[in-house]
Every structure is written in C-alpha cells, then in structure tokens.
Amino acid sequence: MHNMSDIIEQYIKRLFEEADEDVVEIQRAHIAQRFDCVPSQLNYVIKTRFTNEHGYEIESKRGGGGYIRITKIENKDATGYINHLLQLIGPSISQQQGYYVIDGLLDKGLINEREAKMIQTIIDRETLKMDVVARDIIRANILKRLLPVINYY
C-alpha cells in the first residue's frame, strides 16, 4: 500500500494528464480535505516531488483564496532536460538535491532503477567522507560529469 505522499503525488500527476496542459493549479485546503490530511502534508509533497530537479516550477499564493500553481518545465527532449539540470546544479549541491536530480532522471526514463541506485551510492555522504563544503562541491562535479554521459549513451 502506498503512503499518503505517494497518493497525493499520483493525484497531482493525474491532474496534469487530465488537463493535457503543462500547468495545474490546486488549493491546499481542497487537497487536504480530499485526502483527509493536513496542508503541511501537501507542502511536503510539493517540496520533495515537484522540484526544479524533477522538472517543475512552483508558484504559491497563501491565504483564503490561495493556490499552488505547478508548471511542468517543457523539455521536449533529453538534451533540454539535461541542460536544465546542468544549469540548476551550480558549483555545489546537497545530497538531497542530488537525489532529486536522480529522481528526475528516473521519472523521465533517462536512467533505470539500477543506475539510479548506483549514482545515489556514488554521491552519498557515506561515500564522500569529507567536510560538507568539499563534499557538496565534489558531488556537483560528479553529477555535472555524469549528465552529459547519460545524455549521449
């Protein structure tokens, strides 16, 4: 059985399919009521499953009529998505952000589960045992070297 975060994620992805557009607007209160959860659960799903690294942009307006607008970043091909990720990574990247990059590659079918697990192991803090600043820089360099390889092979 899936946990609530998985269920909410699938619901939002289904909204994209049904809308046949690259933009979906949802209301926190409506989703929370629909799934009988607290709005912070929805915030968690948005912040972890619909990130830039996953290929989405988020716009949020709080308050009574507040909404969350999720826009799918349109990359017609793998090269566009890889270039988008390369721009996002910058000089350093945290382990969690690195995992989001890997999840995005997996979601787009650019890598398989086995490759994702191998890349996660390579960029894991237990593999890169050094101070945080150096580790985040090395992690970014590893990902920036891997992404073009994923794109061309």
UniProtKB/Swiss-Prot annotation:
Transmembrane annotation, as ranges: none
GO process terms (BP): regulation of DNA-templated transcription
GO molecular function, a single term: DNA binding
Gene3D superfamilies to which the protein is assigned, alphabetical: Transcriptional regulator CtsR, C-terminal domain (1.10.1200.150), Transcriptional regulator CtsR, winged HTH domain (3.30.56.130)
Record keywords: DNA-binding, Repressor, Stress response, Transcription, Transcription regulation
Pfam family, any one: CtsR_C
Family, as annotated: Belongs to the CtsR family.
Stated role: Negative regulator of clpC, clpB and clpP transcription by binding directly and specifically to their promoter region.
The protein, known as: Transcriptional regulator CtsR
UniProt source species: Staphylococcus epidermidis (strain ATCC 35984 / DSM 28319 / BCRC 17069 / CCUG 31568 / BM 3577 / RP62A)
